[in-house]
């Protein structure tokens, strides 16, 4: 907490940007590119190198302009989507480097292409740092850093360790789960996972908003799953990994912990780790972990147990998972992403990173408190992690309509199902989180102000709904966009939001280089 305050004060006192990082709006490494005269002199008959080394704003001003608009959106708005974050300049430099040029099917030391000396070094270093970031013994844990994203990583685990149509249990999507855990309705298999495997959900106790572990255990006894997923995308409480481990032991099931949302908190040691209980752990790398867009699969290795004959039995996950990633479901890995991930994992072991994650939790707790004081109903009554899930039903409005108003005033949040919902398209909740704004330096009292902005937006949404003639979402949007008094309220709130957001540092680019600062 104290470190977070100090860092924020430090950022506020910086008058001038660090010029060494940028050169006229482009990243510094662009300044080392060959100039036009070199190519005119050495290769007068070859035209394309000149184009290849030209900066983006010259080659494609349309895309450059879109990027500038996105910079302005990130600077002027409030980013509350809990699965999003602002990655660092150093990570973006690695992701935008020459590491993107290389093909490297296979694994370090066993590639199907030549010229991978430095690619192997980067991937091996990334693996080493991944284990270090989560304080894992390399004799007991291994990691694959090649998965392209979280959903593919989960599917790679299923195909590695399960036979077709074997059984998976996971948290139901309307109760906070994720599509990649095998979601299906009574009439349709929504996720491809549910096509290739048999899936059964466990759910929340709707009276408390917590996972119903007693019912989970009863369902597992009847369903006899081969794998149980402990992970969520909209669950504001901590998982009882010990309880699920005991269920897995009874069913001789694999425990897969999907920590995509919370891996940054786990790395910092500010919430309990799933590694003490899980057989396999997956995570994305771009949420609370604050790296590039990718994923990792951690798996147990070494001695699993000693059998009745006194012989050691070893985990057999490593080869199965590696083969499922490549060549099973992927070709060449994205080496620029792996390189950027290595940088992010190094950052995850620093004191600044722990201070940041502590602040994420403090901000989330304060945000939940402020919302509760304004009469908002939180699923489970609060939060233990980086997110809050607000049930809007007691306000007479749904998440879809509130999301539209939030978007209009430059607050990015997302509609989300809550227990009891019957429609995923018009759900009753709004999901919000603190990682992104905490990266910009927001502290507890700033999230009290964010709660004020949210409350003002909800009141506008309720007013728009009352003035709307039709019952469909498009009718609501039409009123939102056509009513002069409503448009005036929206404009005022948007101005207030922007003026507040603009007080805080930009992340990944410098304000002085922006095209759209007003």
Curated annotation (Swiss-Prot):
- Mind telling me which Gene3D superfamilies this protein's record contains? Aspartate Aminotransferase, domain 1 (3.90.1150.10), Type I PLP-dependent aspartate aminotransferase-like (Major domain) (3.40.640.10)
PROSITE patterns this protein is in? SHMT
The source's superkingdom equals Eukaryota
Q: Which residues carry this modification: N6-(pyridoxal phosphate)lysine?
A: 287
The record's CDD domains line, in alphabetical order, gives: SHMT
Q: What's its catalytic activity?
A: (6R)-5,10-methylene-5,6,7,8-tetrahydrofolate + glycine + H2O = (6S)-5,6,7,8-tetrahydrofolate + L-serine
Keywords of this entry? Mitochondrion, One-carbon metabolism, Pyridoxal phosphate, Transferase, Transit peptide
The protein's required cofactor(s) are namely: pyridoxal 5'-phosphate
Hey, which family's this protein in? Belongs to the SHMT family.
What is the documented function of this protein?
Catalyzes the interconversion of serine and glycine.
Subunit note? Homotetramer.
Instruction: Return the protein name.
Output: Serine hydroxymethyltransferase, mitochondrial
